[in-house]
């Protein structure tokens, strides 16, 4: 099997951790970032900067049609960022995003002769997003294999760990400070520790605090 991987890469904490994971697991790593007209272009700038610094082949694919089909708080200024209520999904959920991203990552992987696809989705902290579930990833893996007659393996290194354990993984790679300072998780587009107020920043900070506290014990 080809020892080459394509990493779905946003420039955020999770995908950057997965990028470092892939660099340890595979001989060749390619990063792919999707431009879906997200409000904060800084996300793409972060991904580009990190890929360049690490000397990784990097592709940016235009997925602007996703914004046309599925308006959400990550692409529209007139939609408030808020958690889901009464069983509804959070306003930050982008319908079909992971399905489309992984499908196009699969197309790129096959063209590049890569068998492995890496994504940072996580069921532990999935915030109610249905396309972050393990059952979805396994199902899509089978579908991609059938659709392209190709033996892909979709890897989800973070699937069963929480944010504290994700920080531990980064620390084990010797990259905790790098990921803390250079990645963008914040819904308000602030690099590093972010605004500290949005749901993404709170999840990230709580995980970091929990991990750093565990190191003292």
UniProtKB/Swiss-Prot annotation:
**Superkingdom in the source lineage:** Bacteria
Write the signal peptide boundaries.
none
| Enzyme Commission designation | 6.3.4.20
> What InterPro entries would the database entry show?
QueC (IPR018317), Rossmann-like_a/b/a_fold (IPR014729)
Record-level Gene Ontology MF annotations: ATP binding; ligase activity, forming carbon-nitrogen bonds; zinc ion binding
Q: Which Pfam families does the record match to this protein?
A: QueC (PF06508)
Residues given in the record as ATP binding sites: 9-19
Q: Which UniProt keywords apply?
A: ATP-binding, Ligase, Metal-binding, Nucleotide-binding, Queuosine biosynthesis, Zinc
Where is Zn(2+) bound in this sequence? 186, 195, 198, 201
Role played: Catalyzes the ATP-dependent conversion of 7-carboxy-7-deazaguanine (CDG) to 7-cyano-7-deazaguanine (preQ(0)).
**Subunit (UniProt):** Homodimer.
Q: Which HAMAP family does the entry link to?
A: QueC
Q: Which NCBIfam families match?
A: 7-cyano-7-deazaguanine synthase QueC
Tell me the protein family, please: Belongs to the QueC family.
**Name under which the protein is recorded:** 7-cyano-7-deazaguanine synthase
Q: Which organism is it from?
A: Clostridium beijerinckii (strain ATCC 51743 / NCIMB 8052)
Gene behind this protein: queC
């Amino acid at each position: 099997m080809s020892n080459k991987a394509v990493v779905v890469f946003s420039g955020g904490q999770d995908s950057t951790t997965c990028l470092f994971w892939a660099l340890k697991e595979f001989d060749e790593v390619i990063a792919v970032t999707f431009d879906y007209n997200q409000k904060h272009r800084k996300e793409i700038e972060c991904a580009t900067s990190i890929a360049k610094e690490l000397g990784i082949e990097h592709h940016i694919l235009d997925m602007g049609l996703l914004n046309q089909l599925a308006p959400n708080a990550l692409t529209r200024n007139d939609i408030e960022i808020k958690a889901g209520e009464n069983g509804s999904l959070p306003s930050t959920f982008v319908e079909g995003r992971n399905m489309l991203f992984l499908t196009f990552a699969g197309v790129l992987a096959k063209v590049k002769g890569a068998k492995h696809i890496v994504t940072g989705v996580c069921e532990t902290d999935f915030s109610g997003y249905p396309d972050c579930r393990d059952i979805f990833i396994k199902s899509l893996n089978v579908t991609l294999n059938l659709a392209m007659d190709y033996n892909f393996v979709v890897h989800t290194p973070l699937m069963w760990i929480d944010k504290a354990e994700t920080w531990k993984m980064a620390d084990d790679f010797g990259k905790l400070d790098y990921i803390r300072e250079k990645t963008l998780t914040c819904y308000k587009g602030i690099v590093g520790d972010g605004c500290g107020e949005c749901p993404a920043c709170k999840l990230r900070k709580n995980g970091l605090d929990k991990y750093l506290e565990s190191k003292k014990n």
